[in-house]
Amino acid sequence: MAQKTIRVGSIEIANDKPMVLFGGMNVLESRDMAMQVCEEYVRVTEKLGIPYVFKASFDKANRSSVNSYRGPGLEEGMRIFEEIKRTFNVPLITDVHEPHQAAVVAEVCDIIQLPAFLSRQTDLVVAMAKTGAVINIKKAQFLAPQEMKHILTKCEEAGNDQLILCERGSSFGYNNLVVDMLGFGVMKQFEYPILFDVTHALQMPGGRSDSAGGRRAQVLDLAKAGISQNLAGLFLEAHPDPDNAKCDGPCALRLDKLEPFLAQLKSLDELVKSFPIVETA
């Protein structure tokens, strides 16, 4: 089946094109750390020839505990993003949590992200779609792959077909997520690019009582499984010191492992996409 291509500047995002990377950190902890993280991503992706979009959140609106760090907020977050874009000349992606934020974020960021927990909130979906920006739609942990069609239709009816789907795992009992690899094939029927959010798929929601646990040691194994499915690319979070990260440290790749990690995945992506398509239906 034909696969759509979404363009962000010079980057082409499609399931049948070389992998792209949406990568960065979970939340903006500080301006200096954001610059450090982006600099390393840029160095590695330029060396390996991987198209790159910087990712971070200005607000984590769905933390487990009221005492958990949320981020610098919208205004300061946009200032940091603008500096990153000026300094490194990279496209940006961040998530939007309320309808009134959509237009403000779309003025700064090249891609706006619909959070998984909010993916059925029609007012938010429509507000984001009406900006005309490219939208990365996270698949909710509680939705079946085929149900993503309804969210795509909401965006299309609001006049936006610049859409990307992102798998981040499905709830499996309590405090656990699993990734159904068959779901990628289901979502490919919609013809939009699909990313795999490998770090969030390793979450153990509420696994540490007041915050999420995770399985960082398995990040390469799961990333290889996802990339083997002929996807548009990977969504990845890394941190200089994951054990002391302010959010989702147990899932984050160590920043100093970024280059060997991505080198293996790029080689795998090239191998998988070199094979002819075999129709088995």
UniProtKB/Swiss-Prot annotation:
Keywords: Cytoplasm, Lipopolysaccharide biosynthesis, Transferase. GO terms for molecular function: 3-deoxy-8-phosphooctulonate synthase activity. SUPFAM superfamilies: Aldolase. One of its GO terms (cellular component) is cytoplasm. It catalyses: D-arabinose 5-phosphate + phosphoenolpyruvate + H2O = 3-deoxy-alpha-D-manno-2-octulosonate-8-phosphate + phosphate. Pathway: Carbohydrate biosynthesis; 3-deoxy-D-manno-octulosonate biosynthesis; 3-deoxy-D-manno-octulosonate from D-ribulose 5-phosphate: step 2/3; Bacterial outer membrane biogenesis; lipopolysaccharide biosynthesis. InterPro entries: Aldolase_TIM, DAHP1/KDSA, KDO8P_synthase. The keyword Transferase applies. It is found in: Cytoplasm. The keyword Cytoplasm applies. GO terms for biological process: keto-3-deoxy-D-manno-octulosonic acid biosynthetic process. Its EC number is 2.5.1.55. Belongs to the KdsA family. This is 2-dehydro-3-deoxyphosphooctonate aldolase. It comes from Pseudomonas savastanoi pv. phaseolicola (strain 1448A / Race 6) (Pseudomonas syringae pv. phaseolicola (strain 1448A / Race 6)).
